[in-house]
C-alpha cells in the first residue's frame, strides 16, 4: 500500500528446544553439496521454516523435530530391540500422518495388522466389567434418563414390552432382558422354520464345500465352527470314514442338503431367542474364546470371526435330520444363557485357546434329550449378538428371505 514500506522478515533462528509451531526441512536439500547421512544423524541436520500458530489455524502442531529425532534413533536399533516396541509403534503408525514412521522400514519393521491389533484388545475383561455394571441397581430417579437415552440411541420400541414403565427395571440387565407382550410376536404356524430372534439376515443358503458364509464373500470352516464329531454327542450320525467330509457326517438321510442362516442381533433388538422349530436338543458344546464385535462391518473385516468368538452350540435332530442352533457371543455380551442348562457358565476369566466343553442332555432317565416346541423360550443375551442355524433338510427346502432384510422373532425363515 502507498505510504507504507515493506520490510523483509528476518530468517528464524533454530533454538535448543524444539518449538511446536515450527516444522523442519532437510538442510541438505538447499544445495550444499554434502552427502546425506544415515541413521539418527540425518535427522539432526534440519532447518526451520515458519508454520502458522494455533491461534491462526485452530490446529495443534506437535514438536515434530523431537519426534523425528526419536524415530531416527529407533531406525538404528536392532530387530529384537525394535520388536519389543512393535505394539506402541503400530498405534502411532495408524494415528500419525502417512509416512511419519517411514524411517523404521530401513530395519525391516512392519506395522502389526489392524486385525491383530484389534484382537489384542482385552474384550473378555471389558465384557466382564460391563456385565458387573449391568447388575448395579440404578436409583429410582436415574432410571428414566438412562433408559430413555438407550431407547433414543438404538431405536427401541417400548410399546412392545410387557412392562412399559421404565422405573420397573432396576438395572440395565433387567432392561436388556425385558419380555414382550404375547401379541407382539405371533409365531407363524404355516412354515416349518421360523426366526428364533429379532435381527438382520446376514446370510443364508446351502452349505457348500464344508464352508459357511458369515457375510457375502467371507467364509469360515464348518468343522471349526461346530467342532469335531464325537461319540458323546448322541446324534444319529452316519459312520465316519477316513475320506468322508465333515458335511457328509452331518447329513443323516440320503438326498438331503445342509442349510445355514445367520441372524445378527443389534443392541436395540429384542435380546431373547426362541426355538426355531420343533426339535430335540441332545448335546451342548461350549467354546470359550474372544468376544469381538460381530456387527456386519466387523464380520467383513475378520475372517472366521464366528470361530474366534465364544459360542454355545446346541445340536439335536428334527423331523428331517440334523439341526443345530449356535449363540455367538460378542463384545459386552459375555453372558449367554440357556434356560434349561444350569451348568453353562460363559466368559470365564481363564480358558485354553481352542478348547471346548461337551455336555449331553441324554441320560438314563431321559434318553430323548430336551424337546423344544417352535417358539418356546430357549435363551438370552445381555446385549446384541448373532444366532447361526445349521440344519439338514430335503432339496426342495426354500428360504423366504433376502440378505440384509430385517426380521422379527416368529416370522418365517423357510419351508418345504
From Swiss-Prot:
| PTM section of the record | Is synthesized initially as an inactive proenzyme. Formation of the active enzyme involves a self-maturation process in which the active site pyruvoyl group is generated from an internal serine residue via an autocatalytic post-translational modification. Two non-identical subunits are generated from the proenzyme in this reaction, and the pyruvate is formed at the N-terminus of the alpha chain, which is derived from the carboxyl end of the proenzyme.
Q: Which GO terms describe its cellular component?
A: lipid droplet; mitochondrial inner membrane; mitochondrion
Q: List the subcellular locations.
A: Mitochondrion inner membrane; Lipid droplet
Q: Where in the chain is the site Cleavage (non-hydrolytic)? A: 384-385
Record Pfam families: PS_Dcarbxylase
Membrane-crossing segments per the record: 68-86
Note how many cofactor molecules are bound and how: Binds 1 pyruvoyl group covalently per subunit.
Catalytic-site annotation from UniProt: 198, 274, 385
> Which pathway?
Phospholipid metabolism; phosphatidylethanolamine biosynthesis
> Mind listing the GO biological process terms from this record?
lipid droplet formation; mitochondrial protein catabolic process; phosphatidylethanolamine biosynthetic process; protein autoprocessing; regulation of mitochondrion organization
Any ranges marked Mitochondrial intermembrane in the topology annotation, and which? Answer: 87-416
- Report the domain of life of the source organism: Eukaryota
- GO MF annotation terms: phosphatidylserine decarboxylase activity
**Keywords of the record:** Cytoplasm, Decarboxylase, Lipid biosynthesis, Lipid droplet, Lipid metabolism, Lyase, Membrane, Mitochondrion, Mitochondrion inner membrane, Phospholipid biosynthesis, Phospholipid metabolism, Pyruvate, Transmembrane, Transmembrane helix, Zymogen
Report the cofactors: pyruvate
Which segments sit on the Mitochondrial matrix face?
1-67
Reaction catalysed by this enzyme: a 1,2-diacyl-sn-glycero-3-phospho-L-serine + H(+) = a 1,2-diacyl-sn-glycero-3-phosphoethanolamine + CO2
Give the enzyme's main class according to its UniProt record, as a single word.
lyase
UniProt-listed Enzyme Commission number(s): 4.1.1.65
* HAMAP family given in the database record: PS_decarb_PSD_B_type1_euk
Q: What's in the misc comment field?
A: This protein may be expected to contain an N-terminal transit peptide but none has been predicted.
- Family recorded in the similarity comment: Belongs to the phosphatidylserine decarboxylase family. PSD-B subfamily. Eukaryotic type I sub-subfamily.
User: Quaternary state and partners of this protein?
Assistant: Heterodimer of a large membrane-associated beta subunit and a small pyruvoyl-containing alpha subunit.
User: This chain belongs to which protein, by name?
Assistant: Phosphatidylserine decarboxylase proenzyme, mitochondrial
